From Swiss-Prot:
Gene that produces this protein: apaH
The protein's name in its UniProt record: Bis(5'-nucleosyl)-tetraphosphatase, symmetrical
Keyword Hydrolase: yes
Family per similarity comment: Belongs to the Ap4A hydrolase family.
Originating species: Buchnera aphidicola subsp. Acyrthosiphon pisum (strain 5A)
Pfam families assigned: Metallophos
Keyword Nucleotide-binding assigned: no
Entries under NCBIfam families matching the protein: apaH (TIGR00668), PRK00166.1 (NF001204)
Molecular function GO labels: bis(5'-nucleosyl)-tetraphosphatase (symmetrical) activity
InterPro entries for this protein: ApaH (IPR004617), Calcineurin-like_PHP_ApaH (IPR004843), Metallo-depent_PP-like (IPR029052)
Stated role: Hydrolyzes diadenosine 5',5'''-P1,P4-tetraphosphate to yield ADP.
Keywords linked to the UniProt accession: Hydrolase
The protein's Enzyme Commission number: 3.6.1.41
Top EC group: hydrolase
């Protein structure tokens, strides 16, 4: 029994299945942890989600910003843009069932026995592990609720970038969503920056990668995340494991087997990715 970590599949189904074959992933005994962004940009979002849905308890997923966008588009809250490649998914007779399944996925996975954490963008350096767990549960509860569309209408907000215990309920949810699905850099005071996507090699003070900020969590846990394809080729210190290698941008899909630390990769094949 092995555990594999991967992220940012982005609808690149063919590359994903080849990578699973290369790694000898066994869907009857192995586990797959995915750090979000299953969909969008690549041509086969529907195939990716249907396959993961079929794995049942063999897959552990945290949602990324593109997964949230798909749910919002399906609910009629956001426009379906051409570059999403959502048409096949939205017209599928299985779309409602699959969307409801996605809505019930997590924003944070924690394995206390192995001291592993997974989220899409990362973990706010302003949080300790207990606050992170509570904040994840709060947005998971809202997204899985029957009135999730109202939640999604209110959750998008760029200015909620600093954590305080006295945040009102809505701003607390907004901050949590921004932290789990959007952040890359922080300012020295801990404020999030959700807009700069460049490699740290080309970014100067005052911006600093979130994983280089002081944090009590990184002293205890190995942290797996995606969301940041421009980190490829940049030194990221342990205990952080970036998983987004930019497959949908013409690069590659990568996967780590936890037990022996072996990495697997598959170069981009699809010609419809943007």
């Amino acid at each position: 029994m092995s555990t594999y970590f991967i992220s940012d599949i982005h609808g690149c189904y063919e590359e994903f299945r080849i990578l699973l074959e290369k790694s000898s992933f066994n869907d009857k005994k192995d586990y797959l942890w995915i750090a979000g962004d299953l969909v969008s940009r690549g041509p086969d979002s529907l195939k990716v989600v249907k396959y993961l849905y079929s794995l049942k308890d063999r897959v552990q997923i945290v949602l990324g910003n593109h997964d949230i966008n798909l749910i919002a588009v399906h609910a009629g809250i956001k426009d379906n843009k051409k570059e999403n490649y959502f048409d096949e998914f939205l017209s599928s007779p299985d779309s409602v069932e699959l969307i409801n399944w996605l809505r019930c996925q997590s924003f944070l996975k924690v394995d206390e026995k192995r001291k592993i954490i997974m989220s899409h963008a990362g973990i706010s350096p302003q949080w300790d592990i207990n606050i992170a767990k509570v904040c994840a549960l709060e947005i998971e509860d809202r997204l899985s609720h029957k009135n999730y569309a109202l939640f999604l209408k209110e959750i998008y907000h760029n200015n909620i970038d600093f954590w305080r215990l006295d945040l009102n309920q809505l701003d607390r949810l907004r901050y949590s969503m921004n932290s789990f699905t959007r952040m890359r850099y922080c300012y020295p005071d801990g404020r999030l920056n959700m807009f700069c996507k460049k490699s740290p090699d080309f970014v100067k003070y005052p911006l600093r990668p979130w994983f280089l900020m002081p944090s009590s969590i990184s002293k205890v846990y190995s942290i797996f995340f995606g969301h940041w394809s421009s980190l490829k080729g940049t030194h990221v210190p342990k205990p952080f494991f970036p998983l987004d290698a930019g497959c949908c941008w013409g690069e590659e899909l990568v996967m780590l087997r936890w037990e022996d630390g072996k990495w697997f990769s598959q170069a981009y094949l699809s010609k419809k990715c943007i």
